[in-house]
Every structure is written in C-alpha cells, then in structure tokens.
Swiss-Prot record:
Organelle targeting peptide span: 1-68
Organism expressing this protein natively: Ovis aries (Sheep)
Protein name: ATP synthase F(0) complex subunit C2, mitochondrial
Location of N6,N6,N6-trimethyllysine modifications: 111
Transmembrane feature ranges: 84-104, 119-139
Main function: Mitochondrial membrane ATP synthase (F(1)F(0) ATP synthase or Complex V) produces ATP from ADP in the presence of a proton gradient across the membrane which is generated by electron transport complexes of the respiratory chain. F-type ATPases consist of two structural domains, F(1) - containing the extramembraneous catalytic core and F(0) - containing the membrane proton channel, linked together by a central stalk and a peripheral stalk. During catalysis, ATP synthesis in the catalytic domain of F(1) is coupled via a rotary mechanism of the central stalk subunits to proton translocation.
GO biological process: proton motive force-driven ATP synthesis
Self-association and partners: F-type ATPases have 2 components, CF(1) - the catalytic core - and CF(0) - the membrane proton channel. CF(1) has five subunits: alpha(3), beta(3), gamma(1), delta(1), epsilon(1). CF(0) has three main subunits: a, b and c. Interacts with DNAJC30; interaction is direct.
Disease: This protein is the major protein stored in the storage bodies of animals or humans affected with ceroid lipofuscinosis (Batten disease).
Membrane topology, from the record: Multi-pass membrane protein
Length: 143
C-alpha cells in the first residue's frame, strides 16, 4: 500500500496538480495541448506549463443573416398566434349578446339582470381581446 502511494504521489505529479487546482476552470478548459519531453517520457510525468492569466474566448458571438431571419419569422408567428385571441374575443362578444337576446325572448321580466350580466360578459371578453392584442404588439415591437 505504501509503495502504491509513493508511486502515485511523485513530486512532479503533486506540482502539476497544485498548478491545475490554482487555475480557474475556464483556463483549464481553454488551454492548449501539452508536449512531453524526453525527461517526462522516462518518469511518465508532464512538464508543468507557466500559468496563463489571459483567457481568450475560443469563438466570438456572431449573429448571421439566417439566424436573424429565423428570429423575424418566429416574431411573426408568435404575433399571429396572439392575434387569434382577438378573433376569439369577437366570438365571445357575439355569444354574450346572442345569449342576451335569447334570454330576453324567454323571460322579458329579467331584462335588467340579463343586461347587467351581458355588460359584464362583454367587458371580460373585450379585456381578453385587448390583452391578446397587447401581447401581439409586444412580440412584434419589444423583442
């Protein structure tokens, strides 16, 4: 057991590990491959490299014309899907006032109560339509 520990913990390995642990993670990932010397072939240890502090990114962030076209198409698709809610609002308003007419035809004595419920249904449906329209404009012009 002591022989294995002595073999595994050679001074060059300890030096290499301490150098590796003292670097930041991105410096370790971005580093270049190391070369082995004749001395390191004989002792199976890697020659330690000097600590580099400059971290150069491997690729810079670029947007191409294709990705801009995809973003524009996604905006239009999202705005179109949000505009469908405005059509749903129109259908809801038609349903509310159609139900008002049917209810008034069945029981004319409930005119005032039916009308107040119709106004409430109209307001809720219109609010949802305006919300969908606002989301469509936000998708088009704010993103």
């Amino acid at each position: 057991m002591y022989t294995c520990a002595k073999f595994v913990s050679t001074p060059s390995l300890i030096r290499r590990t301490s150098t590796l642990l003292s670097r930041s993670l991105s410096a370790v990932v971005v580093r270049r491959p190391e070369t082995l010397t004749d001395e390191s072939h004989s002792s199976l240890a890697v020659v330690p490299r000097p600590l580099t502090t400059s971290l150069t990114p491997s690729r810079s962030f670029q947007t191409s014309a294709i990705s801009r076209d995809i973003d524009t198409a996604a905006k239009f698709i999202g705005a179109g899907a949000a505009t469908v809610g405005v059509a749903g609002s129109g259908a809801g308003i038609g349903t509310v006032f159609g139900s008002l007419i049917i209810g008034y035809a069945r029981n004319p004595s409930l005119k005032q109560q039916l009308f107040s419920y119709a106004i409430l249904g109209f307001a809720l449906s219109e609010a949802m339509g305006l919300f969908c329209l606002m989301v469509a404009f936000l998708i088009l012009f704010a993103m």
